[in-house]
Curated annotation (Swiss-Prot):
Residues 1-54 form a transit peptide. InterPro entries: RuBisCO_ssu (IPR024681), RuBisCO_ssu_dom (IPR000894), RuBisCO_ssu_N (IPR024680), RuBisCO_ssu_sf (IPR036385). This is Ribulose bisphosphate carboxylase small subunit, chloroplastic. Pfam families: RbcS (PF12338), RuBisCO_small (PF00101). Transmembrane segments: none annotated. RuBisCO catalyzes two reactions: the carboxylation of D-ribulose 1,5-bisphosphate, the primary event in carbon dioxide fixation, as well as the oxidative fragmentation of the pentose substrate. Both reactions occur simultaneously and in competition at the same active site. Although the small subunit is not catalytic it is essential for maximal activity. It comes from the Eukaryota. The basic functional RuBisCO is composed of a large chain homodimer in a 'head-to-tail' conformation. In form I RuBisCO this homodimer is arranged in a barrel-like tetramer with the small subunits forming a tetrameric 'cap' on each end of the 'barrel'.
Length: 178
């Protein structure tokens, strides 16, 4: 029986310790050379809202659901909705209407993960209104959608087709009782 043996040779090199070292940077000066001013803790000059603190309220968690942009406001009138649509048209955004029959608020059905995505899919009302130049056109479509689905949440979206992002979204109509 033949045996094979192998040996591994190791090579160790020694380099001078000073060859790879870099001298420390000495160009910075200590902070002691700079003049400093010590200010007293004077809180009288800080901005204050004074007595108005008791008037401020947070969003109540019961009874009022938060929907989209502007959802903290009372329902918008037709004139106010038209002004919002005029704004998104001035920004050259494409208006689009969507509606939801069951859940017009944030809930988790299709995704359970936290974060920006809220798990909702809304149904698009017709196609995005490419080439729309007048808020009256959008308001006419909103009226048609309300007539077809009176118990639906309807929202108006402003879509930037250059950047391909949704820039604004707000509830235009809610079912009775919401």
């Amino acid at each position: 029986m033949a045996s094979i043996s192998s040996s591994v040779a190791t090579v160790s090199r020694t380099a001078p310790a000073q060859a790879n070292m870099v001298a420390p940077f000495t160009g910075l000066k200590s902070n002691a050379a700079f003049p400093t001013t010590k200010k007293a803790n004077d809180f009288s000059t800080l901005p204050s809202n004074g007595g108005r603190v008791q008037c401020m309220k947070v969003w109540p968690p019961l009874g009022l659901k938060k929907y989209e942009t502007l959802s903290y406001l009372p329902p918008l009138t037709e004139t106010q909705l038209a002004k919002e649509v005029d704004y998104l048209l001035r920004k050259k955004w494409v208006p689009c209407l969507e509606f939801e029959l069951e859940h017009g608020f944030v809930y988790r059905e299709n995704a359970r993960s936290p974060g920006y995505y809220d798990g909702r899919y809304w149904t698009m009302w017709k196609l995005p209104m490419f080439g729309c130049t007048d808020s009256a056109q959008v308001m006419k479509e909103l009226a048609e959608c309300k007539k077809e689905y009176p118990q639906a949440w309807i929202r108006i979206i402003g879509f930037d087709n250059v950047r391909q992002v949704q820039c604004i979204m707000f509830i235009a109509s809610r079912p009775d009782g919401y």
